[in-house]
């Protein structure tokens, strides 16, 4: 009986994956933003170059912070991204994590319920004001950092839906947004998963993605002009709920100094 249930379960998994491995979101900003030498810098993982928008905001869009959670890494805790040597151009959003199209943001090209996104989606985006400087020796001159966790019921949503340019420019902060696994891929609880060891058995893969993203920020944000000792995480709705989870998680201890939960709540048992 267990074998039959397992085969049935795998059948539905394959059916779902066949429709989402390569699907792209039509809302991605695929316009080629001109690379700017001023945004070239070295991270712990390798060199990147971004661009400067019309408001003078520096942007690095689509920086990988974990290995793609595909194949044998599907339904596993995220793994640190491998280092790269060649200059990585990060001037456009990565595909969002696989999800069903929300009725709130559907347009003429996609319908509610359509599968959009890609499993290879663990990327983050960094925004900095024109005044930011790379890795200053005096941490007092580094800027405050705010890390955004988007809402959407942990089933939908993507960083490209939020535009922090004015916020960054007027408040003189470093802003970071991230993608994390959603729905079926981020929160699946199943006996076969619970048989795994360590964090692989948690089923909270979306939260683990968020923690790894904040860890990446902690390790690298100084290169973008941000203060690694002045990080605030904040999120709205399900993102606010996730903020509370990170605030109480021992795994995330020491990664940030402040937390803001906007219209998010959770229960503790």
Cite the ranges covered by each PLM segment.
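C-terminal motif of bacterial Sec signal peptides marking the signal peptidase cleavage site
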Residues: 16-19
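Alpha/beta-hydrolase active-site loop
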Residues: 121, 199-222
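Alpha/beta-hydrolase fold nucleophile elbow
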Residues: 224-236
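Active-site loop->helix "elbow" adjoining a glycine-rich segment at hydrolase catalytic centers
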Residues: 151-152, 205-209, 237-240
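A conserved short beta-strand
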Residues: 253-266
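Short glycine-enriched nucleophile-adjacent loop
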Residues: 240-252
């Amino acid at each position: 009986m267990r074998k039959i249930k397992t085969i049935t379960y795998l059948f539905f998994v394959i059916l779902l994956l066949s429709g989402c491995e390569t699907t792209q979101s039509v809302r991605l900003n695929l316009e080629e933003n001109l690379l700017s030498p001023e945004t070239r810098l070295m991270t712990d993982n390798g060199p990147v170059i971004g661009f400067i928008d019309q408001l003078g905001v520096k942007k690095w869009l689509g920086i990988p912070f974990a290995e793609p959670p595909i194949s044998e890494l599907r339904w596993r805790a995220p793994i640190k991204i491998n280092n790269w040597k060649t200059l990585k151009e990060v001037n456009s959003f990565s595909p969002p994590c696989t999800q069903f199209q929300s009725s709130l943001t559907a347009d003429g090209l996609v319908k509610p319920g359509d599968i959009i996104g890609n499993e290879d989606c663990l990327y983050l985006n960094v925004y900095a004001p024109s005044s930011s400087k790379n890795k200053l020796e005096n941490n007092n001159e580094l800027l405050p950092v705010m890390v955004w966790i988007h809402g959407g019921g942990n089933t939908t949503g993507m960083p490209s839906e939020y535009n922090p340019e004015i916020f960054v420019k007027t408040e003189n902060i470093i802003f970071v947004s991230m993608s994390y696994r959603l729905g079926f891929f981020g929160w699946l609880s199943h006996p076969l998963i619970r048989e795994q060891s360590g964090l692989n058995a948690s089923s909270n893969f979306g939260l683990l993605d968020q923690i790894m993203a904040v860890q990446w920020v902690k390790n690298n944000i100084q290169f973008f002009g941000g203060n690694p000792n002045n990080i605030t995480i904040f999120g709205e709705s399900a993102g606010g709920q996730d903020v509370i989870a990170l605030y109480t998680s021992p795994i995330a201890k020491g990664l940030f100094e402040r937390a803001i939960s906007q219209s998010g709540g959770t229960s503790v048992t």
